[in-house]
Amino acid sequence: MKSGVAYITVQQFCTFHGCETLIIEEFMDHGIIEVQRQRDVVLIPEAQVPRIERALRLRNELGVNAAGIDIILRLLEHIEGRRWREVEDFEDFE
């Protein structure tokens, strides 16, 4: 585990969000999220929580499967990254 990084267990996340641990395991299997393992406990870094919540919404509200979620999240991150670069380029221009 990385020092200074906050974690929650998969069980805590699932209890709070009312979802099955199998869903999180499916996300892990498809590389949608990154987790840490400490003995028999799977830990979610705090920074991954918004990504998992977004993945859950895509799955539950739109019925997107894990492969589709992976593609959608990658595209959204690419778009968001481009926006930040455009903002930085604009600020450099001023």
Residue ranges and their predicted role:
Residues 2-15, 22-25, 29-94:
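Arg/Lys-rich, alpha-helical DNA-contact motif
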